Amino acid sequence: MTQLATGKATPHGATYDGHGVNFTLFSAHAERVELCVFDALGNEQRYDLPGRSGDVWHGYLADARPGLRYGYRVHGPWQPAQGHRFNPAKLLIDPCARRVEGELKDNPLLHGGYDEPDHRDNAAVALKCVVTADRYDWEDDAAPRTPWGNTVIYEAHVKGLTYLHPAIPSEIRGTWKALGHPVMIAYFKQLGITALELLPVAHFASEPRLQRLGLSNYWGYNPVAMFALHPAYACSPETALDEFRDAIKALHKAGIEVILDIVLNHSAELDLDGPLFSLRGIDNRSYYWIKEDGDYHNWTGCGNTLNLSHPGVVEFACECLRYWVETCHVDGFRFDLASVMGRTPAFRQDAPLFTAINNCPVLSSVKLIAEPWDIGEGGYQVGNFPPPFAEWNDHFRDAARRFWLQRNLPLGEFAGRFAGSSDVFKRHDRLPNASVNLITAHDGFTLRDCVCFNQKHNEANGEENRDGTNNNYSDNHGKEGLGGTLDLIERRRDSIHALLTTLLLSQGTPMLLAGDEHGHSQHGNNNAYCQDNALTWLDWQQANSGLTTFTAALIHLRQQIPALVGNRWWEENDGNVRWLNKNAEPLSAGEWENGPKQMQILLSDRFLIAINATLEVTDIVLPEGEWHAIPPFAGEDNPVITAVWQGPAHGLCVFQR
C-alpha cells in the first residue's frame, strides 16, 4: 500500500469512493494521529494522518477496499488531572465506524492507566473497525409519516420480541430478518400499532461487572460504536446493515414507522476503572464532561457523561442521527437520559445540540422523543424540552397506576393526565402529542407484574435486590406472585383492562410495551437489563390471546374518536370532552378533589367512558341517548342502554350513541 494522501475533512469516518478510502477523526487536543490497518493475519501497518482541518485529522489511502480492518493510535499528553488520557499503546476504534469486529471483554490490556499510562500494547485483543461500502436498493421505500395524532408506539427488543416465536424459522429468530418477517408484519397490523420503537440497536457491550457475574447487558444501553449495528441481531455480521434496512423497508410497506432508542449520553468506557477503546483516548477532554480533578461528571449513572455542548461533539451527534435517517430510513428517535442533551452544564432549551437539531431539515422532520431526565442535579426536566420533542410522561404513568391500583388519586389529577397533562406540556406552542403516555416500559414492571407483585424481585440481577425502583404503585390484589383463585385472576384482569383503556383512550401519544398485550411477566423483576433469557423473551405460545384481542380493539377504537386523533388541546365547550359524575351531571369542585372514584368521560359527544374505580358495584346514570357498549366491551348480547349501567367494582365500560 502507498502512503496516505491528505484526503478531505468530510464525510465523517471511513468512506470508500471506489478507488480508495478517506479517513477522518475529530480530536482537538491530539498531537499526532496514526491510522492502523490490519491484514487477515492481524499484522499491523501504521500511517500518520497527514491532513488537519481545524480539529479534524484526515488522510486518504489509495487502493484500500471495503472489508479493510482498521483502528487509530492517538498521541498527546497523559495528564489525567487536566482530563487528557492519550495513550498510543492502545488501539482505538473510530467513533463513526459503520461496523466493528470483536467483543469488548473484561481484559486489563484494555485499560489505559490511572496516574501513569499503561504501556502494554493491546492490538491483539482490541476491537477493530471495518470499512464498509454503502450499496443498497431501497426500491420505492417511502416514510409512512404517520400524523402524531394517529401514532401508537410499540416498544420492543429486537431479540426478545421474536426469539421464541414458533412461526418464524429458528435460524432467524431474534434478528432483523425476524423483525421484518411476514408473520411479524401481520401481527403488528392486526394489533394496530403504527410505530415500532426498538431498544438500542447500535453496537453495545456488557459491563465488566456483568461479565464477571456471568450475565450480559440485554437492553443495550452501553454503547460502543454509535454508527454501527449490534452484530448479534444479524444473521451475518457482513450483511447486518442490509438485513436491518430490509426490515425497515418491509415495515414501511406495511405503514409502520421505526423509531430507534439511541444512547448519546454516555459510552461503554464507563468510569476511570473502565476500558479505554475510543473517545477517552481520542480526545477525553472534548468528548466528556470533566470535573476539576480530571474525573468524570456522572450524570448518567454509567460512569461518564458525553459533553453534548462541545461543538465537535454536537457535530458528531448530529452526524450520527443523520446517518440513521438518511442511510437507514428510520423515522425517529427516543433519546435515553435526554436531559444530558441540554446540559451546558445546566439544562437549557437553547442548548447547542437542541439548536442544531432544530436547524437541521433532516432531523427536525422526524419524530423526536425524550426520556426527560438524568440523575444529575437539575436533571428532571419533564415538560421542559423544546419543540419538536415529545417526552415520556411519568406523571401519566404514576397517576394511572395510583388511580386504578392504589386508589389514592383525586379525580381531578386523573382527568388532567387523561387530557394530555396540559399543565406540563401546554407551553411553547406544543401540542398534546408532546405527552408520550405510558403505563409500563422496558424499565420497570410489566403490566401483568403491576397487578401481581407489590415488591420487586430482582435477585437474579446479582445485586441482592437493591437495584430497580421501589416506587412501583402496583397492587398484587392480595397474593404476591402469579396464579391464584379464579376470583383473583378476574380482578387482576379487570385492572389490566382498566389500565390499558386509560392508556389507549387518553389524549396524547400512547406507548405500549411489547408483551403487555400478551400478559407477559418478568416474575416481579423490574430491572431486567441483564436478563437475556426466558424471563424477558416473549413466549408466544403462552400468550393471552383474549388480552391481545382486547388491546387491538382498543387501538382500533382510538382511531375512531376525533377528540383523540385531532392532536388539539381540549377546551371548555369545544365538543371534545365533558366530565360527568355518576349521575351524568358536571362534576363539582368537591367531587374533583374528594369525590368517589367514579366518573364519566364523554368524548366527541358520541363516545362515553364510564368509570367505577371503587370496590363497590355502582349504578351509573348515562347521559341522555341510546347507548350500546362497543368492542372490546361489547358482549354477544349487547342491548341498548338508555338509563343506567351497573358498574362492577373496579371496572369501566366504553359506550357509543
UniProtKB/Swiss-Prot annotation:
Keywords: Carbohydrate metabolism, Glycogen metabolism, Glycosidase, Hydrolase. It comes from the Bacteria. Residues 459-479 are annotated as: Disordered. Its EC number is 3.2.1.196. GO terms for biological process: glycogen catabolic process. The active site is at residues 336, 371. InterPro entries: GlgX_C, GlgX_Isoamylase_N_E_set, Glyco_hydro_13_cat_dom, Glyco_hydro_13_N, Glyco_hydro_b, Glycogen_debranch_bac, Glycogen_debranch_GlgX, Glycoside_hydrolase_SF. GO terms for molecular function: glycogen debranching enzyme activity; hydrolase activity, hydrolyzing O-glycosyl compounds. The record marks 443 as: Transition state stabilizer. Belongs to the glycosyl hydrolase 13 family. This is Glycogen debranching enzyme. The gene is glgX.
